[in-house]
Amino acid sequence: MRRVSLLTIALVAGLSLAPHAQGDGGYRLVPNWPTLPAGMYFGLKDAPPPPAEREAQAAARRATGGQQAAQNNTGGPTNQPGISGLAIDQQDRIYVFNRGPKPVMVFNTAGQMVLAGADQEINGKAINPNWQHSGTVDWEGNVYVIERDAHRIVKLSPKLDKFLMQLGTTGVKGTDATHLDLPSGIAVLKNGNIIVTDGYGNNRVLLYDKAGVLLKQVGKGSGGPNDKGTGPNEWHLPHKLAADAQENLYIIDRENKRVQVFSKDLVYLREIKNEWNPWDIGISRKGTDGFAYIADHLLERVHKMQLSDGKLVSTWGSQGLGPGQFDWVHGVVVDSQGAVYAADTYGQRLQKFVAAAASR
């Protein structure tokens, strides 16, 4: 019930983000974006359910803190259909990590699907789309897919047709260098080093070299009830992350409701806190515009944040199923032109926003 009380307080008080935010964020929804080919869909084919049923489901999730089915290790559905994460490459192609028949779907900025796949067998097991969480694209165009409940991350070729590498051991959780426990996020640096948030089970962040050899761990990572913490270098569900132009890492510490900032070598720099519940962070591939975009689950919003000081300069969105609203906003990326893409998981859709004055 704590989530409900926070929501009520925020609504009554106008949310303490107000001194930091301006208007509706200055962004508008691009209608009818993207265009899905015939027979393709996000999430479940016959969903979403009618609005009244969806609102009842949303109320139940808020009442329980939104955590039901979050650690499904049985092979059954996660009850979280739709889009679980987003990534973007150097050509501004948007990669959708889809809890549906095609685990990865790729779109250009015009909303046309240009590639779909990642449904082949890998190391004796096909990727279960119900278990997907997020992924990324490295600087060579290779795609990393997090199959969270299989405790593994698979690296695929740019066309999604060749298996290249795996982090973690398929179907086996653990706390050592060769195992993961419900991993949640990933970023790849220009030199090929890989950063993984091993979040739901281990509360640790891992640094690997390009070959997948573990170099460093930040966090207790013991896999037990005492591995959480609130201090620097400690975590309560490190969730997703992004890098800026200097390759400083902005890592969502979800249940501590903060962002911890590290150097590319995982040296702690600072934290950013606000009245939010951040789930994802998006920074442009160049990372030079000085802003990040936060997917905030508290009131289902996207915030534009200054990287220099963590100040929120604009915000938009609300809880709901209408255009520009969100029901479980779980992923966000930004392209080189400043367009923002948000994954609406239970809404089973991908929404694109552009600056109000923009025409694209």
Model-derived features with residue positions:
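Surface-exposed loop and turn segments in beta-propeller and other repeat-based domains
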Residues: 31-75, 118-126, 164-178, 213-233, ...
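Conserved beta-strand positions in repeat-built beta-propeller and related beta-rich domains
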Residues: 94-99, 145-148, 196-199, 249-254, ...
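Blade-level signature of beta-propeller repeat domains, shared across WD40, Kelch, NHL, RCC1
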Residues: 327-360
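Bacterial N-terminal signal peptides
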Residues: 8-16
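Short loop/turn segments that connect beta-strands within beta-propeller blades
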Residues: 108-112, 157-160, 209-213, 263-267, ...
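Beta-rich, blade/repeat-based domains predominating
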Residues: 41-46, 72-91, 122-142, 172-193, ...
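Short glycine/acidic-enriched loop and turn motifs that connect beta-strands
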Residues: 101-103, 150-152, 201-203, 256-258, ...
